[in-house]
Amino acid sequence: MTQRPLPTKDRLIRTAAQLFQRRGYHGVGLSELLAEAEAPKGSLYHHFPNGKSDLALASATWASDQMLRLIAASFEPAESFHAGMEALCGKVAKLFDKSGQWDGCPISSTLFEGPDNATFRAHARHLFEGWITEGAHHARRFGLADPQKTAETMFILLQGGWMLARARQSSDVLRRLPEMLPRAD
């Protein structure tokens, strides 16, 4: 059975997410993006009336949704918050290795390196708060004393860990992150 190709809009979003993650917002040209997505020239503005900036917001949302699913898949079967963090960090480390050990955070690479505008910053804040909210949900589920603080610590460890892993070109940094999270379980 052959798979149906993704609709053009989805191909544009996924391709943009990958390219922005690799080279940042300003490092990706529209011609290259359209060629990589195998999309006709008019399709970008058909699906994203404001062009590259609308596509950047959509691609960051798509990437964030992938991370939210990864957080949920790591914590839902876990028996403790620490076990969920171990699972999450293991999965993130595998993604790091698969990415070639250089790609940045898909949201930071897109929204913080994009146009200097309040819309991009507000969108990044909203997406990151979603990760923290998901982490706090699981911290609360495991009865941790300060779920918000625990989730913020998780977020900071993941973001900082990814940066250090990039600098060291080693996913070991990511695998060791759970050791740095205070244990309460």
Descriptions of predicted regions:
Residues 1-7:
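N-terminal intrinsically disordered/low-complexity leader segments
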